[in-house]
Amino acid sequence: MKQSSLDLNLSTKKTRKQELLAQMDRVVPWAALVELIAPYYPEGKNGRPPFALESMLRIHCMQQWFTLSDLAMEEAFFDTPIYREFAGLDAHGRMPDESTILRFRHRLEKHKLADQILATVNDLLAAQGLLLKAGTAVDATLIAAPSSTKNKDKKRDPEMHSSQKGNEWHFGMKAHIGVDADSGLVHTVIGTSGNVADVVEGNSLLHGQETDGFGDAGYQGIDKRPDAKEAVRWHIAMRPGKRRALDKENNPVDALIDQVEKIKASIRAKVEHPFRVIKRQFGYTKVRYRGLKKNTLQLKTLFALSNLWMVRHQLLEAQG
């Protein structure tokens, strides 16, 4: 699919939105993802022909990048020409409506294709040497959900729960991720209610081939849990209070321990990058749907796209 107006012509000033679309147009493996989804996409033997699969996939990706609901996406086709161009839609032809966009998402959810989208992207990155498997860093973040009962059901989402972070309480879910300790690319995503402790899912975030695992102090005791992997050496952060008590000035051993903690922290920092991309770059700060299943599937798609965004410069350079 060609979008001539999206090419990376550096002599022309582009908006951030145009730049994002131009770069992602080149780094997303469209052909591989279309091949993945095609067996589950209708051929349109009856009634009006369906929109091109790649167009619908591009629309689905734009929803993730710009936090657009199905209705907002439909309306954006008329307000924002670059969205039409990116999806390969004729400005004078028919546009996918809210229901069409919804049905495409439901098809992805029904067949759990978000898992395969993440796997397909990561296979591509691994083949190019961008995703290694020697170590995994783990972390979790809270994703807010509506706490109001002013809705159709007159109640909050029963699959979301409150969790305390510092002195504040948050209502929602948790996104747990395992990332490549070298590149920071996400390989495993698990969604739970907000009250599940980070350490509970820690060992489930391993892909099975790593020799080392890294986590913050919330993962203390992970190597003693029933699901611990014997082949993995865990490097968990010291609790903040204990580290503050180190006498780095007068005790050489304490000074050495503090240096080790700094090294562990520098490796753990890689796990913050994907969270920053989906929250700040893509604007994902709260759940879009009710229930854990749909929101977890969306998270897997978001992290697949964040992986591509994080290594876009390497991918573009490799293309020449």
Task: Please place each PLM-identified region on the residue numbering.
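Charged, often Cys/His-bearing segments associated with DNA-binding zinc-finger transcription factors
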Residues: M1-A31, A38-P39, E317-G320
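Polybasic low-complexity intrinsically disordered regions
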Residues: K2-S5, L53, L71, E75-F78, ...
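Helix-centered, glycine/charged polyanion-binding patches within enzymatic domains
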Residues: Q3-D7, S11, T211-D212, A217-K293, ...
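Secondary-structure capping and boundary motifs in well-ordered enzyme cores
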Residues: R26-P29, R48-E54, G93-P96, I263, ...
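An N-terminal domain-cap segment
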Residues: V34-E54
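N-terminal core-binding DNA-recognition domain of tyrosine recombinases/integrases
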Residues: N46-R48, T67-S69, L108-E109
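Alpha-helical support elements that line or immediately flank enzyme active sites
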Residues: S55-T67
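Short helix-capping/linker segments at secondary-structure and domain boundaries
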Residues: W65-L71, L185, F282-V287, N307-G320
